UniProtKB/Swiss-Prot annotation:
Native species: Wigglesworthia glossinidia brevipalpis
Entry cofactors: Mg(2+)
Enzyme class: transferase
One of the record's GO molecular function terms: 3-methyl-2-oxobutanoate hydroxymethyltransferase activity
Protein family per UniProt: Belongs to the PanB family.
Signal peptide: none
UniProt subcellular location: Cytoplasm
Binding-site residues for 3-methyl-2-oxobutanoate, renumbered to this chain: D45, S46, D84, K112
Quaternary context: Homodecamer; pentamer of dimers.
Name of the protein: 3-methyl-2-oxobutanoate hydroxymethyltransferase
A GO biological process held by the record: pantothenate biosynthetic process
Location, primary (coarse class): cytoplasm
Function: Catalyzes the reversible reaction in which hydroxymethyl group from 5,10-methylenetetrahydrofolate is transferred onto alpha-ketoisovalerate to form ketopantoate.
Length: 265
């Protein structure tokens, strides 16, 4: 099957067609997701919580991201794979270049990093060296120790202005994609319309170009059985894994998910 590339997502944006993405951390699930129609997989540092059992993503190391990226690439050779640069692995340009190289050589097509205006120079340097970058603004889990808790973003005017400025700066720096996390849907819609690059939302309403969810949330296998309010357990009606993934893709492509119940205003 033809490999998915970044510009396939650009075509979908131009055609106003939504696409579903999901996290994966091993070859078996990556292969299953690919066979069911997922074309974009995120090897997320969320593995710190979902796989390793930590309370945040902060403890995750670059070697662990490399290991899981290799596993996912073996299971889904034709998927577009985005891999997270973990906490403090891109604190300066040299670290960002070295660690991005490691992820690309491990099988990633794109590296993802969290942050606003301060990451623009890093994105520019990576882009000029042919390393595709996905930005990530709004709720940034690596900043949990600064934020104190996982809060909805963009509810006041100053925050909304800041997030729009960050999105524009990240695009101008050369990022190819942008994740919008837990941003009120009116603002995420405005950002999506403003940018030429595709946006991928999580907890940011249905008008982003794509959606991303953590696989454990989709399959209802989270620790203590709790999932975020913006997510959905697609096995709730006693569907098996394959049917749940098919339903997730179908609801995203038809703009049935996320519903108002999974969005913030």
């Amino acid at each position: 099957m033809k490999k998915t590339n970044i510009y396939d997502l650009y075509k979908l944006k131009e055609q106003n067609k939504k696409f579903a993405s999901i996290t994966a951390y091993d070859a078996t699930f990556a292969n299953l997701f690919f066979k069911k129609g997922i074309r974009t997989i995120l090897v997320g540092d969320s593995l710190g919580m979902t796989i390793q059992g930590h309370s945040s993503t902060v403890p995750v190391k670059i070697d662990e991201m490399m290991y899981h990226t290799k596993c996912v690439r073996r299971g889904a050779p034709s998927c577009l794979i985005i891999s997270d640069l973990p906490f403090m692995s891109y604190n300066n340009i040299n670290d960002a270049l070295n660690n991005s190289k490691k992820l690309i050589q491990s099988g990633a097509n794109i590296v993802k990093l969290e942050g606003g205006l301060w990451v623009s120079d890093i994105i520019h340097e990576l882009n000029t060296r042919s390393i595709p970058v996905c930005g990530h603004i709004g709720l940034t889990p690596q900043s949990i120790n600064m934020q104190g808790s996982y809060k909805i973003q963009g509810r006041n005017n100053n925050d909304a202005i800041r997030l729009m400025e960050e999105a524009i700066s990240i695009e101008e720096s050369g990022a190819k994609l942008l994740v919008l996390e837990c941003i009120i849907q009116k603002l995420s819609n405005n950002i999506t319309k403003k940018l030429n690059i595709p946006t991928i939302g999580i907890g940011s309403g249905k008008k982003t170009d794509g959606q991303i969810l953590v696989m454990q949330d989709v399959l209802g296998i989270t620790i203590e059985g709790k999932i975020p309010s913006f997510s959905k357990n697609f096995t709730k009606n006693k569907f098996g894994i394959e049917k749940a993934i098919e339903l997730y893709i179908e609801e995203v492509e038809n703009e049935l998910f996320p519903s108002e119940n999974h969005s913030f205003n």
